[in-house]
Amino acid sequence: MARTGAFFYPARPHDRALTVAGEAERLARGALRHLRAGRLGLASALPRRVPAAAPPAESHPTGPPVLYLPAVSWSYRFQRPQHLALALARAGHPVLYVDGFLRSRLLPARRVLHTQGGLHVLRMRVPGRPDPYREPLDRRTAALMTETILAGLRHERPLMVLVQLPFWAELGRELARRLDIPLVYDRIDLHVGFPGVPVRIETVEARLIREADLVCATAGLLAERPREVSPQVLLLPNGVDLAAFPAPAAVRQSGSPVVVGYVGALGPWFDVEAVAAAGRAFPDWRFRLAGQVEDPEVAALAGLPNLETVGEIPFADVPSFLAGLDVALVPFRDLPLTRAVDPVKLYEALA
């Protein structure tokens, strides 16, 4: 039972059993998806869930709470959504991080996963199990989820509802309307630039931009369109928590091979050809890639004897991984999607 601070969502009978069943379904579906794609070996087919960073130390934030509708699940690769949620909590604002990304019929309707330091991760079962990156919430589902969220609010009026994905547009509008609070859209990606995203998502996002009280953008290109329709646009680039990246203690010994590496998703935007060319041009260098393989073309790199893929690593291991590199890469293809990014991995490498 979570009964601390600004939110109260008591556990219900069978919640734990449903959570276990939902996780088992996730693993099974992920394994089938990978095997159908032709990847070899059951171990590599099973999807890995990288542990998310722990919530902030226990505290009692006194500011008005924030309703946070993020771009990724709390347990996904640690990036801007999780960093910003932690920063808001540490700044004294209780945060309700609504996690509706696990697509399972077996989940409890809602369950609080974390309740430390003013950060509350509320996992919710989304009726109909829509794909959050390709299918926006409909009005009826948004209304049902609004009632669930409002039922757990205690006393203080929230500071704002923050939306990071067009998927949440209807829910964000409904919460803002019911509570009479500002609607803030944090535009962190060119969403329609991702493979398979339908054009209608652009229409949903355009309305969200028009109706938001404030639009934040991580990069200049992402701020251009909002500025055409609203003066309330803030360029808010990414950054890095320097405390999490202490200066490395060891210095590379003379004569040891140069180590080149990358941390992040190995998706369609990853320039496989450029990395392969570099690997062939410098056969005495070692290349290390840390991240989930999301593009089958990455398999072509397996033929390089001086390159290894180490898989997804927890955020806690990123500083030591980067400290072991002589050169950090951000090898993105020239795409509309990549022209609009402000890569967190660049800040982390420079830290």
Question: Can you name each region flagged by the protein language model?
Answer:
Residues 84, 148-149, 174, 198-215:
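Membrane-proximal helix-turn-helix segments that form the acceptor-binding/catalytic region
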Residues 221, 236-248:
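Carbohydrate-associated surface elements
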Residues 286-298:
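Glycosyltransferase donor-sugar binding loop
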